[in-house]
């Protein structure tokens, strides 16, 4: 008899049981026929014992089949038990290739789990998708500072920022409140720890403000999005721990809020101060300009530059900043951006402010984790 390949994978014992029933033989009778203990027959049928070459020959002689049939049944059954593991390896590799799994686990955004189904479900839930081939809805909408499509790592950061923002309590938003908030924020520009008050000021204005540490290679500065049509939210990464960068990025995102941008299409701002202006959309150029002007009056800055350039001494920078009631680091930052001084000059004024911000603003990262 030729070799038969079953359409479904069953243990050889299932076939042995069928053969015995077809012939009306008991396990005791069959054991006597092949000259083996009844225990061997019982264990093969129950799947506790594998079919060996010896038993395959005995079975084939008793049933008139080829020994290859029984060996093929055994080998296919054993392979079927291994295949799910191999499939899991492929699925796991696909998940790690598509999503920043390791970093998400490290940050506590999802839990580490050896069960591929649970890991997969966590990722699908996080990104709001139902299959690995589906793109997160937010990725089709998200606009970056550059025209390049947002990466999955950047989308992961944005998804987390949105989730964290939902936990940030705020008052009802209004444009009038935002204008008041901008004036109050400007009054804090002269203080090293002025950033500490940003969260409370924006909460009164109805703006959800959160900090989410960037993921490796993300290069995100901030984002503007709306939780609903009446709830604007901004998130900063604080990837540059400098007083000038914090205030510039904050005012940049608030300008998006003021213009109701990010309402239907979340805005991801990447390298907002370093990108080539030729690659930046008009709304980003405007937000950058507004942010710079909120910190220093263009007329005042141009007058200062005309008087002092190129001899920007420490005393002159400090005197100018005091007259405008802003921190010297903000002046240094704008002079560097205009390439009027090297980035190595006056760096002592570019003070760190991260600890002040994260002490009062809902923060995910930098040693803090927001519970879901």
Feature map (PLM): residue ranges:
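Active-site hotspot residues in diverse enzymes, especially metal/ion-binding acidic/histidine motifs
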Residues: 2-372
